[in-house]
Amino acid sequence: MKKFFILVLFTINISNISLAENLSFTKIVDLKDPWGSSFINNEELIVTEKSGKIKLINLNSKKIFVIQHNLNYLEHGQGGLLDIIYKDDFIYISYTENRGNWKTSTSIAKAKFNKKNLIFENIFQANPPIDSGYHFGSRLVIKDNYLFATAGERNEGMIAQDPTKHPGSIIRIHTDGSIPKDNPKFDGKSDWLPEIYQIGVRNPQGLTLSAFDGKVYLSNHGAKGGDWFGEAKKGENYGWKILGWGGTNYTGTKIGPKWKPGFTKAIQYWVPSIATSAITIYKGKEFSEWNGHALITSLKDQSLRKLIFNDLSNVKEDVIFKNKIGRIRDLQVHPNNGKIYFLGGDSLWLMKKN
């Protein structure tokens, strides 16, 4: 039977009851600045460390294998090795590419999977390269043969309103790096770069594909407040830095309105900020009562939150836990049993029911 969930934009209710007492947390292995992860199979998880290593972890034996690679990366501020996806015997990775003279870009590379050595070739570079250690994004998701990616605005603000530049946008390309012929540039947005799917984002560090409605969703960091969760929408504009999404500059000065007509409206906003990170629309056995609900991870308050989309009058938010496993950078649902693995702090964690 098909399952549906309904996105609504009215009253927001937040449950104050923690669900953590029904959960257990097990540390699997220690890591260093882990950033992205992806299941290879039911027993192996591939993980990036921002500092430059790609590791293959056997979840049963807890053995860690370091995979060599040829990426021209630069660990600079928030940048380094970022997200990673395994799909059909290929590895896709987003990373901070060294473009020379401390200029870098959010780039995407692809390699045939190999447990010893990954030989990557770039399939995307965000241009122009920028001398900044901030706001790279960058999450990846594959839908059919389309690769979606988030490119942060590199702390450049209004560059997110310039569709002739990649920073501050959502990217959509084919998995071989070619350009889809139905991207916005070929559908009424002739001044847009051909890879751009949507503009006006700041620092989106969450991206997921829903198995229930087939839509792509993202989370985005605001400034001082104004984090949000919403849907990726072709040819639209989330408004940064015309809009402030309810937040302010770090100095306390106003950025702009929370929202106004002509811009994409998010599903949920957070003021003050929770520092939204990785997200997923849960589908699995272990927490079957969560199927179709969005799980939102947080860096700032180290929380896991659940957004429920099955009520016509409100969006309900539950805080599942806080301050259990450190700053949560990523989460993956086990493809067989539905248990959840987190990159929290400097470790890989398993969460399951008691």
Predicted regions: what they are:
Residues 4-14:
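Sec-dependent N-terminal signal peptides
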Residues 7, 109, 124, 230, ...:
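Residues in well-ordered beta-strands of folded domains
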Residues 79-81, 153-318, 326, 350:
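Beta-propeller domain segments
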Residues 97, 124-129, 187-189, 246, ...:
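Short, solvent-exposed aromatic-acidic interface loops
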Residues 328-330:
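Repeated scaffold domains used in trafficking and secretory/extracellular systems
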